[in-house]
UniProtKB/Swiss-Prot annotation:
Name assigned to this protein: tRNA-specific 2-thiouridylase MnmA
A GO BP annotation: tRNA wobble position uridine thiolation
Active site: C119, C216
Region (Interaction with tRNA): 166-168, 320-321
Location of this chain's protein in the cell: Cytoplasm
Gene Ontology CC annotation, any one: cytoplasm
UniProt organism field: Deinococcus radiodurans (strain ATCC 13939 / DSM 20539 / JCM 16871 / CCUG 27074 / LMG 4051 / NBRC 15346 / NCIMB 9279 / VKM B-1422 / R1)
EC category name: transferase
Amino acid sequence: MTAFPAAPDLAPPSRAAQGERVLCAMSGGVDSSVTASLLKEQGYQVIGAMMRFWPDDKRTDTFDSCCSPDAAYEARRVAEQVGVPFYLLDYREPFQRHIVGPFLEEYARGRTPNPCVNCNTKVKFDELVKKAKMLGCRYVATGHYVKRVDNAQGEVEFHRGDDPRKDQTYFLWGTPRDALPYILFPVGELEKPQVREIAAERGLLTAQKPESQNICFVPGKVQDFVAEHLPQAQGYIREIATGEVVGEHLGTQFYTLGQKKGLGLYQSHRVRHVVHLDPDSNTVWVGDYDDCLWTGLKATDANYLLDLAELPTELEVQVRYRTAPVKAHVLHADAEGFELEFAEPQFAVAPGQSAVLYAGSRLLGGGLIADHARELPALT
């Protein structure tokens, strides 16, 4: 991980010296376009950059709009509109190594990955920060809907963006703590309609560009992408209460906890949910809604954006994007991981997803949800 110099005298962005150099991550979307424009207007020396992820042997339509060659063309045109230099940076190898490979490996293990978290942690705020230092930049800026707060102690905190529908702090829990002072989020205090209005006022060509909805390297359904890269393996679907075989499947990688549609059971007059995936025995276990309720979780690969000793024992945790955080009690926390007890049982807490910690609007850190240990009927 990149080592950052100490910066006790770092001024908040609102008081930053004129002409500070900033590397602005551009995606060809409206958020990063406005980010570059606002920074330029605030007196920063802006360098626009887009990270190339798509390989040469892929069709241009195999990557979503935020990562495609067309997006690179639009990002370059916006940089010209704003009046800043633009670089297309080759990150194909790190992207395959850190993002696509682990994404498929997690599905093969019966887990549900979130590649956007890995991308921010291991590519954008690691590889891109290294490039920023090489270019003599003091800051990296992105179009994330996240608020940077410089507190009274001179420390930088990340808080939820002012637009609750667009808040993206969930994806940034893995940001190295020593990188926080060097990251700017110019649109974090804006709502999406305001961002589009700013883009329109400045004549930016991305002002009305539709938002990206998919995982950038998955052009369609995740199941289709997984099927293309992981071999099928026929196995049984079993009832968690009895061990009875109630159906067949073509691989545990095609299922996720809580799933109730597309199970293909032999016959069932009750709604069944996926409650456990066991790739070792190639078994998909199903049961009632209550079988998917969890009273707590354990997380690994933890990262904290404050001193561990300052982590409150009562906090909030968010276990998937676009769901409300829930109150939780910290049973244990160390540098490697943590264990939480929910105030109320939670449905389908999926291993591989992120457990993200908050105190009010402040992002405290997070970890990867660990596999659940549970007793299973003997296989016959």
